[in-house]
Amino acid sequence: MKLNVDLENHSYPIYIERNAIQKVHEYIPVSRKIAIITDTGVPEKWVNIVKQQCPDSFICTIPQGEPSKCFDQYKKLLEEMISHNMSRKDAIIAVGGGVVGDLAGFVAASYMRGIDFYNIPTTVLSQVDSSVGGKVAIDMGSYKNIVGAFWQPKTVIIDPNVLSTLSFRQQHNGLCEALKMGLILDDHLVSLFEQETLDIDAIITRSIELKRDVVQQDERESNLRKILNFGHTIGHAIESAYGLNTYLHGECVAMGMLFFIEDEALKQRVLNIYKKLDLPQVPDYDTATLLEYVTHDKKSSHKTVSTILVKQSGSYIIKELSFKEIQEVLERGPYEK
């Protein structure tokens, strides 16, 4: 299946197909120097399949995990590219999850003022969400995605077969972002999670269609695209304060969504899905600590936070909440009846 992302200054295809990783040479011009950026968590067989199709390529491997989205790894990748005499006509292919895509994309955006970037996401989380849209970034200390850019890929290749090597926890972590998409935009997508057997292909495809539609309307997150931050305001705070070595990103987003689902019947429906996915509960937290992270989040402006509220599955409300109101939400907690 091929979807097109049509933007004002740049459009690109998304290929969603089993065994698509075997066809990289058909989807990407490979007759140039290519840096393949991956991490230690990606099985070598996927990386090697890509490399075998790119005759003049080299592999850059970063340590697995969020801590690699940092200036040190960013600098090392730039040095590696310089040592291989890469030019503006060369390209980067990311083979990995969201961390690899974010870091590789930011390197592509800044090396020689920008070179071609291709993304082959290998996790559910990156396939349903982060690989599409052009948001690339690195962290600074415990502040997530604080340094970054908008740099659209030239092509995205999504092969559900590569998910077979992931643990169930990693798969379910990624599905949280797909569920988020359904809660704000499409109740049918939510209903896919309530089926006895999860149809991963259907969930991925519908999530990408929804993400594509939002990005086409608001490429640079000036208005509509903010809805994709549902669950991230408090989710990022939990991840930064407690979760970088404990919880996965999607798990934190799932926690964050609970604070802003305003219908108790819907919240119970969502909690039933969480139980099915074996997601962790919101940990005990210090309100002041989380509030500190919220106030430094890039979604905050002056003394308010642009917040997404959900009262009915498939729809949303955007509301500016004061820091005081966020404090009250935190004090109330996610499970209050």
Locations of regions flagged by a protein language model:
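A glycine/threonine-rich phosphate-anchoring loop and its flanking beta-alpha core
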Residues: P13-Y15, I21, P29, F106-Q195, ...
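Active-site segments that bind and position negatively charged phosphate/pyrophosphate groups
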Residues: L192-T289
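Short glycine/serine/threonine-rich phosphate/pyrophosphate-binding segments
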Residues: V99-F106, Q127, H236-A237
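Phosphate-handling active-site elements
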Residues: S83-K89, Y111-N119, S240-G250, A265-Q268
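ATP/NTP phosphate-donor binding region
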Residues: M1-A91
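C-terminal charged capping/lid subdomain of soluble metabolic enzymes
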Residues: S11, C176, Q268-K337
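Solvent-exposed alpha-helices and their adjacent loops that cap or buttress functional pockets
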Residues: D6, N85-S87, S110-Y111, D139-M140, ...
